[in-house]
């Protein structure tokens, strides 16, 4: 997948300046950076839900899970099946994300973590050329996060999609990402193999970020 160069300006201030790159299939790209660094703006533009300063053309089908996804006032099972796919797919995803016992519960009565699991299952019902997940496990507990990460890995490998994962969790990036992009003040400061960016970054700003938000040594 080819991402062209693009930028985004708000009230005369450039919030994002992306140089463009190519993304490899069957790879997970962790998008890292502090709050306000441009991560979500990048994700929204690639997903096509936010316009850049100039038109951006990205080929292929794209699935997008925003930070605050919409849940229909229907049952968990009905929400998941709205994406299409088979009942068998829905059963498998509900079981993997511990939603089977909640299948008849209305979505507007779910907790934050339950909703996060449901909307992830709904997205993964379909096959896309690229999937963009913006903080998909932020509301989940450790057990649910582990199940979600396992599904994300499985989906990426089985479909061969490009998966873009916006995350504040360095631990999550270390567990499942193949590649990492580090944004700072709207600029892509560093990009490369996750192992390199997360443990042996070239830029001082990346090192400082890793030291502040988490230990850079392997455990």
Regions found by a protein language model. Name each.
Residues 167-168:
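H-loop/switch region of ABC-family ATPase nucleotide-binding domains
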Residues 69-84:
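Conserved catalytic motifs of ABC-family nucleotide-binding domains
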Residues 32-34:
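The feature captures the beta-strand-to-loop junction immediately N-terminal to the Walker
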Residues 88-102:
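Conserved ABC ATPase "signature" region
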Residues 131-134:
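Catalytic Walker B motif of ABC-type/P-loop ATPase nucleotide-binding domains
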Residues 198-219:
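C-terminal boundary and immediately downstream tail of ABC-type ATPase nucleotide-binding domains
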Residues 106-110, 114:
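Conserved ABC ATPase signature
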